[in-house]
Amino acid sequence: MKKGFSIIMAFVTVMTMLFSGVTFADDTNENTESKTKECNFTNLIVFARFSDEDEFVDNEYSGNSVRKITDNSYNNADFNVSDYYETASNGKLHMNSVYLFDKGGSIQLSHPRGYYAEYSDENPEGYTDNGEKSQRMYELKTDWSEAINRAISAGNVITNYDGTKKYNFSELDKNNDGAIDAITIIYKNTTQSISVGWSSPLWNYKDYADYVKINADGKTITSKNYVQVTNSYNYLYKDNRKNVILPMAVATHEMGHILGFKDLYNSSNSSPVYYMSAMAKHMSPVPQFISVKEREAKGWLTSDNVKTIYQNGQYTLKEASTRGDSQIVGYKLNLKGTNKTLYLEYRNFGTGGNK
């Protein structure tokens, strides 16, 4: 990841309040808007509001619009989702997030927000049982999918966050497998009194929906994996260049699911892995690394990075670094008679230590 990210990981607890945001201790002057390597994975971001809600993409928080804060968090700040995975992948994944707007704004869904939430005295239109809940979760997928299809049919194209750069729809399928690499649906933040619980339709989660169909250079590409999130703009952070960003933990964790990583916790919040992976108990605002085992399983680390121990001896292991992995970052030991493997890595979560 870029220099700024490695520094903020070292000083994630050293912050000072600045107006309504937070400024990170950081000394980088690198302009991260200039990507040095060609993208090989595209994340399509679509802002969505419900039928009872007004436009929000240009609402400002700490002097920045929602669309700009989002792009800082995914693409351009000194620490962002794209750079996180470029570093975690050992330089193998180069992600770019692009946008689909409807006449410059968000897509609008056909139902109010409360329709997709649990019934209560304050929300009489909500679902009342698990059957209705499942049906409305399905309806939510088709709701935003159909809104995307309508926006594209109306002539809207994919662009950067402010519409000044256009992209061909073929950019959405970088590996040419006929599927959109990733879709991120970002719902409008809400002040409504609506209950959003674990596994409910409005929860932040990754799922599958194949209802978006796009013609790209004469072939059809289809949606598959997507994530949906609802961001709060109550607590924002700033890098050294005054880029305002969201806490990155949720966006990074959910993107991990798109890439194939599993949750390392359960619904009772039991998390044996705890802070050893961003897929378990992720830190905020900048999440820690995913584990050596996960990165190895993905093919991001090789036998040059994770060495197998075959004999007794003295082995040296340095702290996990955010500056790239050209050296050994872990060891593994096959435990005789157990069909299990013990992974060893050095993670320092103390102040000033790499995460």
Protein language model annotation of sequence segments:
Residues 51, 68-76, 87, 150-158, ...:
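Structured segments of extracytoplasmic/periplasmic soluble domains
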Residues 188-354:
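Extracellular hydrolytic enzyme modules, especially secreted metalloproteases
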Residues 83-219:
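Active-site-proximal segments of metallohydrolase catalytic domains
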Residues 1-7:
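Positively charged n-region of N-terminal signal peptides that target proteins for export
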Residues 31-69, 189:
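Fold-level signature of zinc-dependent metallopeptidase catalytic domains
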Residues 17-34:
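Sec-dependent signal peptide cleavage junction
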Residues 54-102:
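Active-site-surrounding "flap" and adjacent substrate/cofactor-binding loops of secreted or lumenal enzymes
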Residues 39-44, 93, 178-183, 274-275, ...:
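Loop/turn elements at helix/coil->beta-strand transitions in domains of secreted/extracellular proteins
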